[in-house]
Amino acid sequence: MTILNTAKRALHFLRIGLAAKKLQRTQNETERLLAKRALAGLFADARGITMKVGQLFAGTDGATPFQELVEGIEPLPLKAMIPLLEKELGQKVKSVFRSIAPAIAAASLGQVHLAELKNGDKVAVKIRYPDISDAVDAELRLVGLMPGVGPVNRWGFDLDAYKRSLRDNMQRELDYRSEAQRQDYFGRAVQVPGLQVPKVYMDLCRERVLVQSRAEGVLIDKAANWPERDRLAIGQTLVTTLFKSLFVAGEVHGDPHPGNVFYSHDPNGQALVTLLDYGCTITIAEQRRLALLKLIAGCRERNPTKPLDCFAALGFDSKKLSYIGGSLPALCQILFRPFLLNHPFNPEQWQLGQGVNDLLGDYRWWFRSAGPSDLFLLMRAFQGLIQQLQQLDVNLAWWPLLQQAVGRDLIERAMAYQLPAVELPTATALSFDQQAAKLCVRVTEGDEQRVSVAMPAEAVLDLEHLIPEDVLERIKASGKIDLKQLADSIRANGIIPRQLFVFEDGGKTYRVWLE
C-alpha cells in the first residue's frame, strides 16, 4: 500500500466525517434524506473498516440509504475473482465446482458467489477482495492516529486498548480459516430450536476463501410482516441463541447487522433463523460468563452480591468504579431491566439511555470508560437483538428464556461462584440487598393522614417530576431543601434506605424517604 493510497483512504475518511457532521446538523427532512444517501454512498465506496462502520449505521437506522449497505454494494466481476480463488485452492475452479455464478452480494472484506460442488452440494463461496488486507492496514494506521477528544479525553477512556481491540478483530476477520473454525464451533456448541448455522467445508477453506452450505431466506424487513406466530418463534430463537452462545458456548456473534440473518420456513412451516458471517465473534472466558450471570441473578433476587466485584471480574477497572460504587446496584436495575420482569418485556418502553443519565449524569462516561475494550462488541450484540425484536414487534419474557437456554444448574453454579477479591473500601461497594426497595411518600395534616404511597425505589431518580408542581415551587422557594444536592447525594451514595426530606407548608407535612 503506497503513501498515496494511504492518503486517499485518509481523504475518504475526512469526507465521511464531514458528511456525517452535515447529516447531524440537517433539520429539513428532505435534506436529511439526501445527506443520508450521500453518506451511505461514501461508506459503500470505501469497503474495509469504513464500510463496516456504515453497516453499523444500517443496524441502527432503518432508513433506505443505509439499508442498501446491508444488501451489499456493487460486487467485483467473477473474472476478477477467479484467479484469486484458483490460487487459494491450488487447482482450477472446474476441478472443484460444477458451476459458480457471479457474486450475489458484496460486503466489507469480500463477496459471496453461489456455486455447486462436483458432488452436487449447493454452496456459497466467500472470497476476500484482492488487496483488501493492505487497505485495512492503511485504515488501521489512520485509526492509530485518532486523538482522544471529548468524553474520550475527559473521562480517561483507554483509547489505545480500543485501537488494539479494533486491530486484533480486523486482523482476525481477514483470515477466513479462523472464521471457518469459529463458525464450525458455533454450529456444534449453540444448538437452539429454529436456528441454522451453515455447514462449513473445512477442506476447501483458505485464508482468503470460505466455502459453506448455501443459505436462503429473506431479510428482517420482510419477516417483520409475517404472522405473529412466526415472529414470536423468530424472536425466541434470536434471544435464546444470544443467551446460549454467551453463557454456555462462550462465543458470541458480534456482527448483528440485518444482512447477516436470513429468515425462512422449514418443510413443516416452522420459522427458521439462519445466522451468517462469523468473522466477528467475541470469545467470553468462563470467569466473565459466570460473573455476568451472577450479576443478573443477584440483581433479580436482591441478594448480598456486590455489583462492583462482578464488574471487576468482567474486566472493569475496579478503582474507577469505586468512585460510583454506591450507584452500581441501581445502575444494574436499569441495565438488566429485561431480566427482572416476570412478564413479556417491551423494548419500546426501555428508556435505557435516559435511565442511566438520570442516575449517573455525566458520570455515565466514567462508567463506560471503566469497561474493558471488548465490551462494545458484546453491547453491540445486545443492541442488535433489541433492534431485531423491535422490528419484529414482539415482546418476550427474558428470564424464563435465559433459564431455558442455560439450565438451572449453571445459574446455581454462577450464584455460588466465588468472585476474585477486590481490594477496595467496603463503603464503596454496596450489595443488592443493601439497596432500598421502596420510595415512600406521606402527607399529613394535623393528626390526619392525607396521602400515603409507595413506589419502586428507582423512582427517586425522577423525584422532581413526581412532586406536584405547586408543591415543588414552594419547596424551591423555601430554600430549605436543595433537590439538586439531594440527587447528587443519591448518585454518590446509592439508593439506600434513608430519609430524604421533611417539608412543612400550610399546615401540611410532607415526608419522603427510602426503605
Predicted feature residues:
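Broad phosphate/nucleotide-binding scaffolds in NTP-utilizing and phosphate-metabolizing enzymes
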Residues: 1-243, 263-286, 297, 305, ...
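Phosphate-interacting basic helix/loop segments used at nucleotide- and nucleic-acid interfaces
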Residues: 95-96, 100, 180-182, 244-247, ...
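Acidic surface patches and DE-rich sequence motifs
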Residues: 117, 266, 445, 504-505
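Residue-level signature for short turns and capping positions that connect secondary-structure elements
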Residues: 130, 216-217, 446, 458-460
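Conserved catalytic-loop position in the HRD/HxD motif
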Residues: 250, 255-257
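Short amphipathic alpha-helical recognition elements used for nucleic-acid or partner binding
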Residues: 291-294
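Compositionally biased, non-globular sequence tracts
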Residues: 417-440, 447-452, 459-515
